[in-house]
């Protein structure tokens, strides 16, 4: 079974915004990933909001879905009970709905890896206790 890459907001925005701090890293990483990357609607909503806030067009984000690079592979309605449980468990982290959806997506796949800039994913656990593998710039590059 192949690894499933789950895309978070930060790398998607960094990939699409040339001026973003992690643009180069996001582009280099994207070039190594095998589509489709899985994501959820809250991540897309966050990304669209951030893109607009920075004066960027949201069309390239939607084009990633249209081209099959991103796949919306999640239903909040179907996964409502586990999402509520995750958000209660990580109340102290102020877990967002987007993060809860990504953790739940990681729980639904045997070999997940979350592509993120969010250090909270170092704390979150799938299925209660399993570390979630992440794709994240190393700590030195995050300080630059």
Task: Locate the predicted segments by residue.
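Residue-level signal for well-ordered alpha-helical positions
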Residues: 18-19, 50, 86, 127
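Short, well-structured N-terminal submotif of metal-dependent ribonuclease cores
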Residues: 1-39, 51-63, 135, 139-143
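Active-site neighborhoods of divalent-metal-dependent phosphate/nucleic-acid chemistry enzymes
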Residues: 73-115, 119
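A generic structural signal for short hydrophobic patches within well-formed alpha-helices
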Residues: 12, 44, 121-122
């Amino acid at each position: 079974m192949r690894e499933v890459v789950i895309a978070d907001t930060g790398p998607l925005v960094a990939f699409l915004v040339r001026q973003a701090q992690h643009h180069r890293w996001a582009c280099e990483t994207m070039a190594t990933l095998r589509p489709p990357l899985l994501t959820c609607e809250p991540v897309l909503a966050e990304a669209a909001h951030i893109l607009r806030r920075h004066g960027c067009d949201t069309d390239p984000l939607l084009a990633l879905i249209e081209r099959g690079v991103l796949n919306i592979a999640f239903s909040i309605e179907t996964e409502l009970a586990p999402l509520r449980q995750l958000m209660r468990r990580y109340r102290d982290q102020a877990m967002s709905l987007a993060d809860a959806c990504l953790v739940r997506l990681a729980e639904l796949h045997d070999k997940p890896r979350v592509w993120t800039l969010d250090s909270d994913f170092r704390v979150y656990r799938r299925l209660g206790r399993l570390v979630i593998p992440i794709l994240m710039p190393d700590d030195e590059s995050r300080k630059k």
